[in-house]
Amino acid sequence: MTTSAAALQSLWDSVSTEDAHRHAETLTEYINTNGLRTLLSERILDELLDKLKDKKQAHLRERAAIGLGAVASKVAGKNAPMPLGAEPWLVNAIPPLLDGYGDKNEAAKKAAEGAMGALVPLFPPEAAAELLEMLYSVITSGTAKWQAKVGALKIISRLADLAYEQVGDELTQITPVLTQGMHETKAEVSKQAIKTATKVCGVIDNNDIRPFIPDLVGCMDRPDTVPDCIKKLSSITFVAEVTGPALAVMVPLLSRALNERSQTVQRQSVIIVDNLCKLVRDPHTAAMYLP
């Protein structure tokens, strides 16, 4: 009878990537047969995470990522043996898997990306805020690999589709992180931050503001474009209700514009603020942005 230790050892000893996938499936069958508790009680998850962080042996990092990907695919989500799958236990795998995006070994890197691809869709929209916090810590870290930061930014882009409403609720926290990413010295991070900002701003449901999303993102990247953006916005006749996601992007822009030296920009900004305030119907939304 297979034990978890034997299944793990077979995974570590696998002679090829294809062989590793077969042994990883055997491991998931063991977990599904003996219960989710084995992930912790038999230290299966600890073993996978330890090997994922192995500094010397790239093949072990690859095997561990393959194992985690299999657990995400076979012991969680729609394939979970019971309503509660392995998702809560897999949260701690996110930072080391993202770190694997920068692995010098191509096979280990590919396995880490595959595991994250299987893991991210498992998180329900209600868990988006917790997942975002983990991604923020990677993007703003001074020690994280640039590939990990790019990977975290791409995941935020995916969340804009997977958890549309929740990303809208979190825009106030997301935009400063993305702005920091835009100013990274590594061009790949900066470019992805701009793409991600454009994607997440797509959750704004205000049809008056949506055509100006590229301009709003441009202001995050280049503050010197604020006067031109304000000039464009001042020509709008706002009629659509202004909700939280719209304010999350507009308030930082208007705050910056009101500090511009140009009285013309300040005057235009005040007019925009006045027009927006009239269209905020939810007092709870307005209260979030009151000084």
Locate predicted features.
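HEAT/HEAT-like alpha-solenoid repeats
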Residues: T2-Q9, T38-L52, N79-Y101, E126-S141, ...
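Generic N-terminal initiation segments characterized by hydrophobic and/or small/turn-forming residues
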Residues: A5-L8, D46, A65, I94-P95, ...
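Alpha-helical solenoid scaffolds in large eukaryotic transport, assembly, and signaling factors
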Residues: S10-G85, L119-V120, C201, F238-V242
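HEAT-repeat alpha-solenoid elements in large eukaryotic scaffold proteins
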Residues: V15-Y30, A58-V71, K78, E106-A115, ...
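Hydrophobic residues within the alpha-helices of tandem HEAT/HEAT-like
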Residues: L27-N32, G67-P81, Y101, A115-F123, ...
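Short linear functional motifs in flexible/disordered or boundary regions
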Residues: G35, L60, A76, K109, ...
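Short leucine-rich amphipathic alpha-helices used at interfaces
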Residues: R37-L39, A86-E87, W146, A160-D161, ...
